Amino acid sequence: MRSIYLLALVACSNSSGPAPDPVADDDPAAVGVDVAALSGLGTVTNVHAVACNGAPMGSTCRQVTVTGCPGIASEPLDAVVAVRPAMGTLRGTVVHFKGGGGEGFQGSDQNYEAAGFRNVYISWLTDWEQTQSAGIKTAACRPATILQWVFTEPTLHNSSRTLGFCGEGFSGGSGQLGYALAHYGMGSVLDYVNELSGPPFTRIDIGCNGDAPPTSMVCGVADTTRLPSSLNAWENIQSPLKCGSTSVPPSELARWKSDSIGVGGVYNYPKTQVQFFGCTFQATAVTVMGNAYFNTISQAEGGNPNLAQYHCYFQSDGCQGEQLGTGLSDAKQALIAGCVPRHQ
């Protein structure tokens, strides 16, 4: 049976004992208010129609180029943007981000169209996290830029404040949304966000540090904190170091920490509701990391359940690893109810 955890129950995420959550942020300056983008955005260019190969049925597709992101201005990246129109009266726009490197289309089986939502699916041509020498936070300018473009594009959301503008991401896709909120000011445009199994990049310095605690308690279950080897390339970790190394130099740990979603960003989103859905059974690090991001938001927002909630799922709910079981249908209903205009 699933459980919903609000700030008043944050202790339950560490219920096995009094030890502090190893993923909790110890930097009191790492909370803030909903302000303009902390990091600059790039530009969407070269917009043109393309065939919808592999896109959800009924989509029309455009390929775009994201360029000009600070720190990686000479490293443009293309994405395919697939759009499925709403059925009936239009209620808003939902932007979807897939896990891993973001190649492919996430969330088409949720069928939000039937509830009146235009669906926009982002598929990167290569891993959005990958840069020549920077880290994931710098690369996260790319999804934030494309999110801002969808919001303002006249043929898409057209900057409407009478319709909901919302996001949904799975695993690494929830990381795209997490960075957009925490480090790129997207709390100023997003009304509602579903974070499904993630985000995984809340504390890279803990997830990649072989000397850090290997597990953390989430909803009474000890789940892994260890991030996968894909972080080696995405975070440009130089050999002989790797994600999972022990005796990591302090300067490298500091870089990993600085590149994390949960450090040094904005975590108070007074006009954005964020809901998290995580599986505790045979979980990957996305469960611990997603719970840590939720805790950071909840603390910044005073535990307001209208702004942030964390939904736990267990083996009895049919979840396993990053798959949510009954949580997927709960997430669908939460978005349908929560994707309403809040920035009016």
Language model: regions and residue ranges:
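Ser/Thr-rich, Pro/Gly/Ala-heavy low-complexity intrinsically disordered linkers and tails
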Residues: 1-3, 7-37
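Short beta-strand element of the alpha/beta-hydrolase
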Residues: 80-84, 89-99
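Conserved alpha/beta-hydrolase
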Residues: 112-130
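Primarily recognizes the serine-hydrolase "nucleophile elbow" in alpha/beta-hydrolase
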Residues: 160-220
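Catalytic active-site module of serine/aspartate enzymes centered on a nucleophile-bearing elbow/loop
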Residues: 314-344
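A short loop-to-beta-strand scaffold at the N-terminal edge of the catalytic core in hydrolase folds
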Residues: 62-63, 70-86
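Alpha/beta-hydrolase active-site loop
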Residues: 132-159
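Serine-hydrolase catalytic core
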Residues: 225-316
